[in-house]
Amino acid sequence: MSNPLVNWWRSHNFNEAVKSQNNRVAKQLLKEIENSGAKLSWQQKLFKERLQLEKLLQKKNDRIKEADRHLEELERQLSFGQLDDSLGRIDELTLFPDTKFIEHISKSFKLRDCDESMIQCTGIDEKIFNNFEQHLAGFIKNELNKLNREKNNVDDLLKQAVDDIQKLKEGQDPQYSFELSPHIYLMRYFLDNVYCTYLAWFLIYKAGLLPTKVNILDIAAGPGTVAYGLGLLLQSSSDFFSMPPMHISYYSLEQQKAFQYRGLQFWRQYMEPQAMNAYFRFDTSSIFDRENQSKRLPKKFFDFIVISHCFFNDEERREKSLQIYKDIFTSSLNDYGYALLIIQEKKLLIPYNVRRVDDCQHELSVVRQFIDELGLNLVWYKYLNSIGSRTSPPNFGKFARENLPVKEFISPLFRQHFKLPYDIHYGVDDYVILAKKR
């Protein structure tokens, strides 16, 4: 039998199994269809999503039963005048994915599954991001105005920081050490990176993996991009369900103290009034200072260790950093924790002498090779991409103007300080990789 005929026969039998509510047979046939590489029909996709939701519901029920068991044990101990750490474990539940909220985010960001791994994203939650961007632009303007009153060489300082950060366009690693580097970063790359981490946390939430009590280590944290992405996602959910008590412990590991300071300064102005229950701890040191870090970083403590865009172009620094990351995952990630890696397409592919991947299997082999270097096991990955293609359009500027949300409040600052005659748009071209330690 030819493959099309085999696929048709499997699909026919699958439909019959679903109609007769024979879930065991339907599951087996769905697995065979997926393994064959055939594209899933809408009914098969719907059935698969139903299975995933049932699995999440069962997981939630199991956690509730476990919490009830801990509560009974705690009550028993209290009756005997005893108390252990059971109380701390009762609240370790995950946020259960809300269907309407997931639909809202998918629609707002115009998320489209292009293939097994690539998701096109051309939209935004305007209510959340417009307000956030407007406040950010105001924050940057106020800081620069304050500096203009205090110093006579602000233009020179701005040029230093702009020239440094523009090295990214040339495939080099910026120093980020100039006085106004934080301001220029906030102006140029902060919103895109928050946009990406927002979507990364959304994928984790959608998979039912986001705890209500979460300990996060953010390596090379910058101004706290990872915390902002999570904070805005939780803010987005307020119209859809009642948020259970959340507790976010955020550990920022960052070499540049000025980035940490500016990030915390803006957080206090914008995020804290949103009643965000977040505790910050700052470790101002280089990732290459591993000996001292190993003494400070808690052991087997973190639910998520995140590395967002801190992967080097320089080969020697890249190899050294990957070994350090591997050591940190081994020592500081708890037994049930996850590594969340966000890396640009070029920085993932080029070290393996790959310029472009044209199929998912080739892409998967590169991702697995990368994960293996970090001593991790892959859980899943997604390639978030604004253009919906693995090849760039001949005129990306035209595509952006016609399809991507503009940064309405930051663009005037960008035009002024980068001396470029066009607006900038929200966009993403990153791999979001979730992994666990071995």
Predicted regions and their residues:
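Generic helix N-cap/helix-start motif at coil->alpha-helix transitions
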Residues: 2-12, 23-24, 39-48
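Conserved small-residue packing positions in alpha-helical repeats and bundles
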Residues: 13-17, 49-55
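Domain-level detector for long C-terminal conserved domains
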Residues: 19, 25, 29-38, 59-101, ...
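N-terminal auxiliary segments of SAM/dcSAM-dependent transferases
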Residues: 81-167
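Class I SAM-dependent methyltransferase Rossmann-like catalytic core
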Residues: 173-208
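Conserved class I S-adenosyl-L-methionine
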Residues: 212-222
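Conserved SAM-binding loop of SAM-dependent methyltransferases across substrates and taxa
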Residues: 223-243
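Conserved SAM-binding motif I beta-strand of class I
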Residues: 249-254
